[in-house]
């Protein structure tokens, strides 16, 4: 064991999504298309909510940061995954692996709390409309975004440093298509009980606390909606529709990964779920908000008309 502890690992080999040669080209084309749509959609949402004068409300402030999160973790994973489809050996350096893990944890963790902040914003807008501008002031919105960034950066650095200061045994094949904390643990020679406990505790705290905020907000929203007339209900459902869809898809995927029985848990199952929340969800989110939000649709139409007037 002592000899294993002295083994230096300079790089890792990612097993990728599949080792079936016939699937490499079609999967590359599929995921490239998904990634390009995701980047364009989220960049477009960031620019639109920043520049359009009618989208300068707390809801779109949070939506801009949600798009930034989606762009962040999809870009942390996507380009390297695409490169792996066209090379013979899916190699990632030791330090790039650590960097990828750190950024991924920041973005994916922050998204949980951004979605929570958005649900609270919806609660205030529907249940306390007269006090909305007072409660959801610019300073409050900035704090609700800054805290998740700082907290998740701390957790990310803690987990990444803990893992990469432990000893690897020399076996460097990661059973995944990117560097994530759980697939890295079997490669460690050192006792992993402490880091496993850290990951479990913070994953549970993040997932449960953010989900409770979302559930409580929607429970109070539902109570308020039941007291409204039919026109008010329709407007409230329209306001909540896009966010609720995103919440169900995102939390549903994470709960599928972490709540399934240990006997049925496998890295292959995790790969499928990971593909969904690292690539598919970041592509879907801007589409959901574009299709289900009237303000965003009108802003897109105004922007398109302005571009047509400039170039035509």
UniProtKB/Swiss-Prot annotation:
The keyword Transmembrane helix applies. It comes from the Eukaryota. Its main location: membrane. Keywords: Cell membrane, Disulfide bond, G-protein coupled receptor, Glycoprotein, Membrane, Olfaction, Receptor, Sensory transduction, Transducer, Transmembrane, Transmembrane helix. SUPFAM superfamilies: Family A G protein-coupled receptor-like. Residues 1-25, 76-99, 161-197, 258-270 are extracellular. Pfam families: 7tm_4. Belongs to the G-protein coupled receptor 1 family. This is Olfactory receptor 8K3. The lineage of its organism: Eukaryota, Metazoa, Chordata, Craniata, Vertebrata.
């Amino acid at each position: 064991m002592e000899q294993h502890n002295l083994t230096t690992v300079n790089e890792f080999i990612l097993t990728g999504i599949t080792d079936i040669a016939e699937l490499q080209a079609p999967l590359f084309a599929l995921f490239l298309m998904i990634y390009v749509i995701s980047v364009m959609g989220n960049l477009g949402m960031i620019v639109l909510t920043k520049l359009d004068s009618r989208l300068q409300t707390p809801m779109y402030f949070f939506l801009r940061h949600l798009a930034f999160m989606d762009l962040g973790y999809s870009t942390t994973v996507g380009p390297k995954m695409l490169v792996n489809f066209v090379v013979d050996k899916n190699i990632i350096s030791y330090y790039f692996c650590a960097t990828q893990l750190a950024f991924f944890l920041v973005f994916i963790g922050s998204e949980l709390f951004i979605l929570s902040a958005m649900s609270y914003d919806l609660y205030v807008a529907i249940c306390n409309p007269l006090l909305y501008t007072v409660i959801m002031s610019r300073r409050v919105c900035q704090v609700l975004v800054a805290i998740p960034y700082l907290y998740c950066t701390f957790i990310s650095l803690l987990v990444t440093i803990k893992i990469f200061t432990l000893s690897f045994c020399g076996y460097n094949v990661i059973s995944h298509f990117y560097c994530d904390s759980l697939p890295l643990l079997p490669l460690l020679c050192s006792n992993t009980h402490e880091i496993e406990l850290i990951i479990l505790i913070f994953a549970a705290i993040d997932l449960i606390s953010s989900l409770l905020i979302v559930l409580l907000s929607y429970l109070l929203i539902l109570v308020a909606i039941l007291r409204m007339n039919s026109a008010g209900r329709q407007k409230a459902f329209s306001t909540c529709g896009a966010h609720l869809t995103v919440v169900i898809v995102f939390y549903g995927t994470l709960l599928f990964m972490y709540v399934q029985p240990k006997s049925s848990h496998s890295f292959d199952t995790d790969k499928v779920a990971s593909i969904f929340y690292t690539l598919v969800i970041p592509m879907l989110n801007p589409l959901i908000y574009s299709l289900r939000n009237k303000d965003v649709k009108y802003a897109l139409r105004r922007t398109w008309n302005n571009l047509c007037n400039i170039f035509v």
